[in-house]
């Protein structure tokens, strides 16, 4: 347990020191920074804010986790594959950010390129992590999926990777939402006695808390796709490594809601010839523009943050209650 806590503290301190250095480098190199393409007026002031800050906490968490797991003889297959997903999905995000920031290609990687790399990572993860005989845990039941488990695994990894990416739309929202989700999985890992996975979880929590110091409103840096895609993949990988896949639907309700809002909006728009359900999606922008109803007073970013964090916290507590109190 001491090693796991140490991982979190060390990663927190590295990120706390690393982010200011990253921002300073960004400014000195006169890199353009974040481009704003959203129809939210208050976001236009964010244009030029350094992005790709996720690179700092990602490298810190991966290196610290690897070294401490190696030192404490906890470098298991599961740890290795969770770190692999962090690195590969982080690389996909890095390439996406690089094309946007340095090559001025607004869409970054095209969807097919991004999906191909994410699927490749998913296949490798499936082949090498310690899976439970292709069994899918649903509450207290075990469903044998056989060869179809790989389809589920790919859907889970790619889906939640992109879902967290959609959530990263206002200052601090994604970073603390993921801290809450990881904290719930930290409890599950501890109860299961999987201290190896707990080490990686606490390392990333430390990195995200260090990052949040500079990412809360008004954000001095954004995590970019390099951070958000890696974090989403990590959550999916951890849920599978702990054999509690179903829990991510509740623990990750914020990401599910964000993604569902986009799917509903696009479908309804096409079916009705231009009508919308929400003012704007992902749905956090709907609240920014007009509160819960979309027609009321606009919510500040802090208010949206606390609302979503509250939902995520309640969902995480509900999941733990279902697992251990019912």
Swiss-Prot record:
Q: How does it sit in the membrane?
A: Multi-pass membrane protein
Q: Is-annotated flag, keyword Cell membrane?
A: yes
Could you tell me the superkingdom of the organism this chain comes from? Bacteria
Entries under InterPro entries matching the protein: Glycosyl_transferase_4, PNAcMuramoyl-5peptid_Trfase, PNAcMuramoyl-5peptid_Trfase_CS
**Has UniProt tagged this entry with the keyword Transmembrane?**
yes
**What cofactor is this protein dependent on?**
Mg(2+)
Q: Name one GO molecular function term.
A: phospho-N-acetylmuramoyl-pentapeptide-transferase activity
Residue stretches spanning the membrane? 3-23, 51-71, 79-99, 115-135, 138-158, 169-189, 195-215, 221-243, 306-326
Q: In which pathway does it act?
A: Cell wall biogenesis; peptidoglycan biosynthesis
Keywords for this entry? Cell cycle, Cell division, Cell membrane, Cell shape, Cell wall biogenesis/degradation, Magnesium, Membrane, Metal-binding, Peptidoglycan synthesis, Transferase, Transmembrane, Transmembrane helix
Q: Which HAMAP family match?
A: MraY
Function comment: Catalyzes the initial step of the lipid cycle reactions in the biosynthesis of the cell wall peptidoglycan: transfers peptidoglycan precursor phospho-MurNAc-pentapeptide from UDP-MurNAc-pentapeptide onto the lipid carrier undecaprenyl phosphate, yielding undecaprenyl-pyrophosphoryl-MurNAc-pentapeptide, known as lipid I.
Please identify the protein, giving its name as recorded: Phospho-N-acetylmuramoyl-pentapeptide-transferase
């Amino acid at each position: 347990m001491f090693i796991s806590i140490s991982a979190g503290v060390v990663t927190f301190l590295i990120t706390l020191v690393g982010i200011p250095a990253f921002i300073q480098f960004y400014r000195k190199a006169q890199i353009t920074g974040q481009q704003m393409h959203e129809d939210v007026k208050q976001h236009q002031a964010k244009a030029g804010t350094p992005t790709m800050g996720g690179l700092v906490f990602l490298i810190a968490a991966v290196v610290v986790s690897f070294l401490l797991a190696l030192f404490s003889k906890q470098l298991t297959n599961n740890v290795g594959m969770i770190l692999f997903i962090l690195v590969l999905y982080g690389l996909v995000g890095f390439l996406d950010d690089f094309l946007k920031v340095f090559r001025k290609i607004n869409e970054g990687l095209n969807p097919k390129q991004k999906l191909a790399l994410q699927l490749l990572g998913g296949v490798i993860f499936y082949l090498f992590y310690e899976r439970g005989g292709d069994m899918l845990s649903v509450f207290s039941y075990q469903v044998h999926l056989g060869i179809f488990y790989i389809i589920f695994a790919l859907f889970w990894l790619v889906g939640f990777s992109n879902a967290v990416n959609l959530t990263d739309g206002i200052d601090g929202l994604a970073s603390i939402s993921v801290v809450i989700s990881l904290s719930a999985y930290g409890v599950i890992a501890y109860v299961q006695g999987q201290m190896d996975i707990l080490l990686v979880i606490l390392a990333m929590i430390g990195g995200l808390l260090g990052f949040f110091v500079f990412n809360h409103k008004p954000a001095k840096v954004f995590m970019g796709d390099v951070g958000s895609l890696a974090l989403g993949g990590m959550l999916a990988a951890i849920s599978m490594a702990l054999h509690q896949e179903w829990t991510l639907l509740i623990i990750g309700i914020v990401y599910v809601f964000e993604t569902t809002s986009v799917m509903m909006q696009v479908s309804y728009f096409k079916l009705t010839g231009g009508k919308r359900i929400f003012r704007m999606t992902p749905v956090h922008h709907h609240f920014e523009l007009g509160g819960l109803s979309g027609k009321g007073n606009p919510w500040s970013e802090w208010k949206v943050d606390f609302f979503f964090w509250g939902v995520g916290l309640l969902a995480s507590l509900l999941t733990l209650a279902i697992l251990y109190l019912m």
